[in-house]
């Protein structure tokens, strides 16, 4: 799949990021490689193959769930948001 300027602009809009002009060509190339890799994975025939690894069997170790309240974390996260108010992200309305 070819990543063109139109698709990159749409991805920028959806992700609410702006790719610098000097990095657009390299980003398009990298995204193209990722899409090609996924297309290769999609073309593999895996019907009838037994899974060789899964975490569904309960082998993942449990950890204690300890509540924490660090008041700096929301500020650190929201400082990267284009818009925020009262510890919430403000995003454009996409569903009518």
UniProtKB/Swiss-Prot annotation:
Matching InterPro entries: Asp/Glu-ADT_sf_sub_c (IPR036113), GatC (IPR003837)
Single GO BP term: regulation of translational fidelity
Enzyme's top EC category: ligase
Enzymatic reactions: L-glutamyl-tRNA(Gln) + L-glutamine + ATP + H2O = L-glutaminyl-tRNA(Gln) + L-glutamate + ADP + phosphate + H(+); L-aspartyl-tRNA(Asn) + L-glutamine + ATP + H2O = L-asparaginyl-tRNA(Asn) + L-glutamate + ADP + phosphate + 2 H(+)
Protein's UniProt keywords contain DNA-binding: no
GO molecular-function terms, A-Z: asparaginyl-tRNA synthase (glutamine-hydrolyzing) activity; ATP binding; glutaminyl-tRNA synthase (glutamine-hydrolyzing) activity
A Pfam family reported for this protein in Swiss-Prot or TrEMBL: GatC
Protein name: Aspartyl/glutamyl-tRNA(Asn/Gln) amidotransferase subunit C
Keyword annotations: ATP-binding, Ligase, Nucleotide-binding, Protein biosynthesis
UniProt organism field: Wolinella succinogenes (strain ATCC 29543 / DSM 1740 / CCUG 13145 / JCM 31913 / LMG 7466 / NCTC 11488 / FDC 602W) (Vibrio succinogenes)
Gene name in the database record: gatC
Nucleotide-binding is among the record's keywords: yes
Entry superkingdom: Bacteria
Matches recorded under PANTHER family: GLUTAMYL-TRNA(GLN) AMIDOTRANSFERASE SUBUNIT C, MITOCHONDRIAL
Function: Allows the formation of correctly charged Asn-tRNA(Asn) or Gln-tRNA(Gln) through the transamidation of misacylated Asp-tRNA(Asn) or Glu-tRNA(Gln) in organisms which lack either or both of asparaginyl-tRNA or glutaminyl-tRNA synthetases. The reaction takes place in the presence of glutamine and ATP through an activated phospho-Asp-tRNA(Asn) or phospho-Glu-tRNA(Gln).
């Amino acid at each position: 799949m070819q990543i063109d300027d139109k698709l990159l602009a749409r991805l920028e809009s959806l992700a609410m990021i702006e790719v610098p002009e000097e990095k657009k060509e390299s980003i398009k190339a990298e995204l193209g490689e990722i899409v090609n890799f996924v297309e290769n994975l999609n073309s593999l025939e895996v019907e009838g193959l037994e899974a060789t690894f899964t975490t569904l069997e309960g082998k993942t170790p449990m950890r204690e769930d300890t509540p924490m309240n660090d008041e700096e974390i929301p500020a650190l996260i929201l400082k990267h948001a284009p818009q925020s108010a009262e510890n919430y992200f403000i995003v454009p309305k996409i569903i009518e």
